[in-house]
Amino acid sequence: MIITKETDYALRILRVLLDGEKHSVAEMSETELIPTQFAYQILRKLSAGNLVRVSRGALGGCELSCDLDATSLYDLMGVMGERGVLCACMEPGFECRWQDKHGRCAIHCQLAALQRKQDEAFCAVSLRKLLAGGSDPQDTSEM
């Protein structure tokens, strides 16, 4: 599983919005070093996923519209359109020619178990904790 650049940018946008204030796209792009055209694309997804609210006009801007304590990294990845599977055979509807010919696949079973553990770990990490967590990047005990 890899967190794409798009999800990385989404996390950076949410980090700016942690203060509860409205921010312009230009400000967020400059602060978080996100190309402006990508920021707009990402904000559309975050807005469609009800994570942020975007208002237009002179007093417009972007602000959080979700509870970051109740929203997980797994949720964000879903909003961004990431399936987050370890292997293509984990995709829904994937037809494995090997399993069709030979039956049960031990590799698939082991990867499925790892996939479940990974999904559980990503579900257990709130966005607030991820974005505002402690100062030691090696310490994941509180996550």
What is the predicted function of each stretch?
Residues 3-34:
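N-terminal helix-turn-helix DNA-binding core of bacterial DNA-binding proteins
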Residues 39-49:
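Basic amphipathic alpha-helical segments that dock to polyanions
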Residues 65-143:
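Non-DNA-binding regulatory cores of transcription-related proteins
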Residues 49-65:
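Beta-hairpin "wing" of winged helix-turn-helix
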Residues 31-34, 40, 68-70:
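Compact, glycine-rich, soluble single-domain proteins
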Residues 25, 31, 56, 65, ...:
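Solvent-exposed interaction patches of small proteins and small membrane subunits
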